[in-house]
Amino acid sequence: MIPRAHITAWRSRTPWSNDAQIEQDLVICRALVEIFSNGLAAREVAFRGGTALHKLYFDTPGRYSEDIDLVQVNAGPIGPVMKAIRARLDPWLGTPQWRQSTGRVTFYYRFESEMKPVTPMRLKVEIATREHFTVLGFKHIVFSVDSPWFRGSADVLTYAPEELLGTKLRALYQRRKGRDLFDLAMALQRLPGLDRLKVVDCFNQYLDRDGRQISRAEFEANLARKLKDAVFTSDVPPLLALGISFNATEAHQCVQEELLRRLAGEPWKQPDNMPKRG
């Protein structure tokens, strides 16, 4: 899909060592510009998730991603939004497989890498269709791509970093992916002026919308269990950029000190027979 020379040229702009990841990165960058260059899509969806954090708020991304996570910002039929996004992506990515489930629509675009060894690749574009709100207000950030293969820029609708991290904290509790811990720790270290209390407030407000409450002890116990799980801790290393390392214990300590201790309730009491980390 992308001429090899253009993939090689993009290498100087990315921190990835793997040719397939470099190609994927360029595909994601173009897809973002394409989506937010469509007038309807630019008004109706906002960009969030780990890819948003690394692409919009970090000088250089810390980890690789193959997904674009979007949120439908206004209540209404999702059909026109789906049509608008496909109008920008299908002409160069082909016809996607797609799935609609409760609260989300997901497109899967599949292709093969140009560089050898030929690798099956995909771009997943997911739209959350029920969270039509923002805690801290939306932000517009100009995102640009300058490649011989594609040049363009778009005004991307997204969230304040504290709100992105509030939803990332929710993801850390709800799913078993070490990348959520990595993203939180990296943001706490890299983003000066980040308001920790606002991150926690956003986390709590999203939980309120879900009709849930999570105490400090519940969260700490949940994370302690995950840190003993090899699936959780092995999730990150294959995704890391050149020169970036991940120490789960240090990341845990950072997130604990900066965020979890600010949650409501008493701290979790670790059982005497449970080995301590670090």
Predicted regions and their residues:
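Structured mid-to-C-terminal alpha-helical surface segments
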Residues: M1-V45, L56-Y64, I68, Q72-G278
